[in-house]
């Protein structure tokens, strides 16, 4: 009972002390309350911090003061420096009036860097009037120019309509119809860069003459027929021979070795299944050994810097024949054979080196169309567009080619004539025109 009464007394004291502390606005924790409750001495009130209340001004006065301070600290907003001059010119009059309203005297300052407004305005007005006058003159001149061009270019527009697109609708991916125009742009440049010399017989060679060169190529035509090589191989062979002899002296005894070596290289490049080296040695009746051919092959390739991808007459002839047949209702196979025949006739002639391969190909198509049909002009807008040659540019080449066509009977170089006199080529070597082609250029 004594313990219960003591506990009751302590709880009562603790409650009283806690209430006193709350009255004194002191934060009480449990430990502090317990400590105060255990001690029998009366608890001292905690020190109360007295905070002086600062007198606040009225809201109205504060707002007016803020406005005054803001007006004192307010500055002009930064602007784009490049607009300063223009804005100063435009707002000069307004600023002068505003200054007068403020009661301040202003004076006009004429210093360096300031613009005379009246002078600038008059100058701008003069410039604007000049510009408008020039624009009106240009507009009238352009209208007159359009009228003149429309009258002068009616024939050109008609010609453009007559050009047949030979690349559209081609399904064979090997024709590269999407890139054909760009490809032949590059080929036209390449034929100028990789062209053999036209005077190497005089400047470089001493034992070789044009006749010996013609005999070698005529024999290589027979070799290509013996091994059934494509015509691209024959054209590349002749190109390699001429390019090598343009910079290297060759003895007469090594001329045939050079011929079979160049055909071996061309066969490796163009043929699917090229003849073996031993076959080329055999075709010369074993005049040259295998080691001699290999040695010459290395010499030729090093001299040409291994540049074997060159445009030949056959490269252009393939495309020009397609352009010639595009305007025909029924393409004539005889025209293709005849153009190939004329082009191959030029291989044996040293004098044709002065003509570009593209020019020889275009002339072959021209002469072939004339030989088969004298009722129509052999050249049209489509051929002129794709060959890039006008009729006048073909004159010398066509006339020289016609001489080869008419004088084959008296020539000793008959391999090409014999080749195209076969039935598989429609015997086009026997075809001639009743009217000479020079009549076309004299009209």
Curated annotation (Swiss-Prot):
Residues 1-10 have a biased composition (Basic residues). InterPro entries: Cyclin, Cyclin-like_dom, Cyclin-like_sf, Cyclin_A/B-like, Cyclin_C-dom, Cyclin_N, Cyclins_cyclin-box. The lineage of its organism: Eukaryota, Viridiplantae, Streptophyta, Embryophyta, Tracheophyta. The keyword Methyltransferase does not apply. It comes from Arabidopsis thaliana (Mouse-ear cress). One of its GO terms (molecular function) is cyclin-dependent protein serine/threonine kinase regulator activity. Transmembrane segments: none annotated. Signal peptide: none annotated. SMART domains: CYCLIN, Cyclin_C. Keywords: Cell cycle, Cell division, Cyclin. Expressed in tissues with active cell division: apical root and shoot meristems, lateral root and leaf primordia, floral meristems and developing pollen. This is Cyclin-A2-1. Gene3D superfamilies: Cyclin-like. May negatively regulate endocycles and act as a regulator of ploidy levels in endoreduplication. Residues 11-25 have a biased composition (Basic and acidic residues). The keyword Cell membrane does not apply. PANTHER family: CYCLINS. Residues 1-61 are annotated as: Disordered. One of its GO terms (biological process) is mitotic cell cycle phase transition. Belongs to the cyclin family. Cyclin AB subfamily. Induction: By auxin in the roots, cytokinin in the shoot apex and sucrose in suspension cell culture. Down-regulated by salt stress in root meristem and shoot apex.
């Amino acid at each position: 009972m004594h313990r219960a009464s003591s506990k009751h007394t302590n709880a009562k004291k603790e409650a009283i002390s806690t209430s006193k502390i709350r009255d004194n606005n002191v934060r009480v924790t449990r430990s502090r309350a317990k400590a105060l409750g255990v001690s029998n001495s009366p608890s001292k009130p905690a020190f109360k911090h007295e905070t002086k209340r600062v007198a606040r001004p009225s809201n109205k006065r504060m707002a007016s003061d803020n406005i005054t301070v803001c007006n004192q600290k307010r500055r002009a907003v930064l602007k784009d420096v490049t607009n300063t001059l223009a804005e100063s010119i435009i707002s000069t009059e307004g600023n002068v009036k505003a200054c007068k309203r403020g009661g301040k005297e202003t004076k006009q300052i004429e210093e360096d860097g300031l613009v005379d407004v009246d002078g600038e305005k008059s100058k701008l007005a003069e410039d604007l009037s000049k510009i408008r006058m020039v624009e009106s003159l240009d507009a009238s001149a352009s209208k007159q120019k359009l009228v003149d061009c429309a009258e002068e270019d009616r024939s050109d527009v008609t010609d453009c309509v007559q050009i047949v697109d030979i690349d559209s609708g081609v399904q064979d991916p090997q024709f590269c119809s999407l890139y054909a125009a760009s490809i032949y742009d590059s080929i036209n440049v390449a034929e100028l860069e990789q062209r053999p010399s036209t005077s190497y017989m005089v400047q470089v060679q001493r034992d070789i003459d044009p006749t010996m060169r013609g005999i070698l190529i005529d024999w290589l035509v027979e070799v290509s027929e013996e091994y059934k090589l494509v015509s691209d191989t024959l054209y590349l062979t002749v190109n390699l021979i001429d390019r090598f002899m343009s910079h290297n002296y060759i003895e007469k005894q090594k001329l045939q070795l050079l011929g079979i070596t160049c055909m071996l290289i061309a066969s490796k490049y163009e043929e699917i299944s090229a003849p073996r080296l031993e076959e080329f040695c055999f075709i010369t009746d074993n005049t040259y050994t295998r080691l001699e051919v290999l040695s010459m092959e290395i010499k030729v390739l090093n001299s040409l810097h291994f540049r074997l991808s060159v445009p030949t007459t056959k490269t252009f002839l393939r495309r020009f024949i397609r352009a010639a047949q595009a305007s025909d209702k029924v393409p004539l196979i005889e025209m293709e054979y005849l153009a190939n025949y004329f082009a191959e006739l030029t291989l044996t002639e040293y004098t044709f080196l002065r003509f570009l391969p593209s020019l020889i190909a275009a002339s072959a198509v021209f002469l072939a169309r004339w030989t088969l049909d004298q009722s129509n002009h052999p050249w049209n807008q489509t051929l002129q567009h794709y060959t890039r040659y006008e009729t006048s540019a073909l004159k010398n080449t066509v006339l020289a080619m016609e001489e080869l066509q008419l004088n084959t009977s008296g020539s000793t170089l008959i391999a090409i004539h014999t080749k195209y006199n076969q039935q598989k080529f429609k015997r086009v070597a026997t075809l001639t025109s009743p009217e000479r082609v020079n009549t076309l250029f004299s009209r």
